[in-house]
Amino acid sequence: MADLLSVPLKKPSEVDIVNPLKNLIQSRYSTADQPEDYSEQINEFSKLRNNAIWRAFEKYESSLEVIYSYYDQLVSLETKVPAQEVQIPFKWKDAFDKGSIFGGRISLTISSLAYEKMCILFNIAALQSSVAATQSVENDESLKLAAKLLQQAAGIFSHLKSTVMLSIQQDPTPDLNPDTLGALSALMLAQAQEIFVLKAIHDEMKDQIVAKLSSQCEDLYSECLKMFQRENLKQLWDRDWIATIAGKQAGYHAIAEYYQSLVCKSNKIIGEQITRLESAMELFKAAQTRSGKAAMFQDFANKAQRNLNEAKKDNDFIYHERIPDIKSVAAIGKAQLAKIVPLGYPLSQNFQDLFSELVPVVVHQAMAAYELRKNEIQNGEISKLRDSTQFLNRYALLVYNLNEYCSQTNLIFSPNYNAP
């Protein structure tokens, strides 16, 4: 492959989600006249979680659909049960922590579906990067899949960066730090642009296009390198990550110069062609030195060296053009095809909600508020009716007593009697 960097997965811990969910749903939704039993669905949900969190470590494309389904189920369930009442202690370990010699690891436990969702999203993006890294550069469909997954991963890390602190409301593990997530999003985007460069070369696109794509790739790796070298982050990464990024930044600058030299060659601008090839050779050597990989971009370096020898020979015998300084030549244009793909829902292709019959919590709360208000109105009206009934009863008793009194004193009484 193109020596892509893949993000390590967060390590989960097994938890009992069956009993807490069963108790919560029964207490919230089940009544004496309408008992609710979701035991089967809850057991399936538990199996789905176990399958998703452990299948991710197999790092196959088929594992993506499994973890997508679990994420979709989490999103759906979060709308149907009160988040503050979920008492499931989800524990996740930091993805970049190697542990000490005593076996200790950085971890965080939070009883929150939102936290579980954040960790699953991190692992989705990490798995996408791993699957992308296994794709072949010789196959067009593989290149398309790699570009798609890397852009989606960039979107997920970007989404996590902006939402994680609000979701968990406490200090996260280092892998979920917003600065870390921003750096990972930048890395995924740079690698996606790299895939577009490789596809353009594979498709034999015009030299000018490849040069512009490579120039943009160099810019993205340069920005990525700045983030990875921050003091609060650089201790997180594997030993060769920063070196690889620095090497690719120089390497894609070199490739941009190489392909721009081919444009100069086709336009018979031999002096500039030689300048760009000389610059490309220096950059290829810098890429190999920075990365610590002597073979990095070696095939391109060999092509550039052959072209440089031929160009110098032609210039010495035919053109005799002046060789300009690399700083004086026109800047190479840029073309960015890699984009951050926003997180969508659902992620899985055929998502089926296990709890489709559960009323969303907002609807349940609205219905509860409706029932409460209805009872208040009904009780108020009944109270008014009782008061009116008591008044009429007292009035009727008064009339009866007056009639009795009048009959005993030979007086005539009528409620409608008008005195003269």
Where on the chain are the PLM-derived regions?
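Amphipathic alpha-helical interface segments within eukaryotic helical scaffold
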Residues: L121-F122, Q128-Q152, F157-F228
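Eukaryotic intrinsically disordered, low-complexity segments enriched for acidic and Ser/Thr/Pro residues
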Residues: M1-A114, D175, D203, D207-I209, ...
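Structural register within alpha-helical repeat arrays
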Residues: K117, I124, V131, L189, ...
